[in-house]
A protein has these predicted regions:
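His/Glu-rich zincin catalytic helix
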Residues: 1-73, 109
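Residue-level micro-sites within transmembrane alpha helices that shape
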Residues: 54-58, 127, 169
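Active-site-adjacent, His/Asp/Glu-enriched structural segments that form or flank metal-binding
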Residues: 61-145
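Rossmann-like NAD(P)H-binding beta-loop-alpha module
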Residues: 151
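Short, basic/glycine-rich phosphate-binding loops at helix/coil junctions
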Residues: 154-160
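Single conserved hydrophobic/aromatic residue that forms the stacking wall/gate
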Residues: 160-171
Length: 171
């Protein structure tokens, strides 16, 4: 494992494993710990015919692995007072757990199993399709979400428009 020095606060240690996996560790005396996997891909990385896939995968990873059914996944951390969750945004997809430090091994093993061995059962794909459709409809019925999207489009589209002349300038 190679230890890196980057622009992180000194309280953080950052490592890169031989397989390229990056680890950021913050030592703490707290009795509560957090562990997660972040994938540097979110909705912004989807092609037009892939829209919604990052969010869909985020839901499906909880539906089964090669050695666990969905209820095993959900109960694994809850049984020891921990929490398991995930989110997707425009920049990343994240799965994480909060737990008492004594259960780090349990949390890390579960997250690793989910990230590397999810099975995406067909019956769960069909069920989750309905859940995602409901979430999209709820999102589209929320004016504050739509206003934020419009605002973001105005900002970023104006930045693209402003920078276009310099990108295409002939020298």
């Amino acid at each position: 494992m190679k230890k890196l020095k980057e622009n992180l606060p000194s309280a953080f240690n950052r490592y890169i494993l031989p397989n390229g996996l990056r680890i950021i560790h913050e030592p703490s005396a707290s009795k509560v710990a957090y562990c997660g996997f972040a994938v540097d891909a979110g909705t912004r990385d989807e092609l037009e015919n892939e829209q919604g896939m990052a969010h869909f995968v985020e839901h499906l990873i909880f539906k089964g692995t090669a050695k666990r059914k969905a209820w095993h996944i959900l109960n694994r951390m809850e049984n020891v007072g921990g929490d398991l969750n995930a989110y997707t945004n425009k920049e990343e997809t994240m799965i994480y757990s909060a737990f008492l430090t004594e259960h780090f091994g349990r949390a890390f093993e579960l997250l690793t199993d989910i990230v590397f061995h999810s099975t995406f059962p067909q019956r769960e794909i069909e069920k989750e399709t309905e859940v995602i459709i409901d979430e999209i409809q709820s999102y589209e019925d929320n004016p504050s979400e739509l206003i934020f999207d419009d605002f973001e489009d105005l900002i970023f589209l104006s930045l693209i428009h402003i920078s276009e002349p310099t990108r295409h300038a002939q020298i």
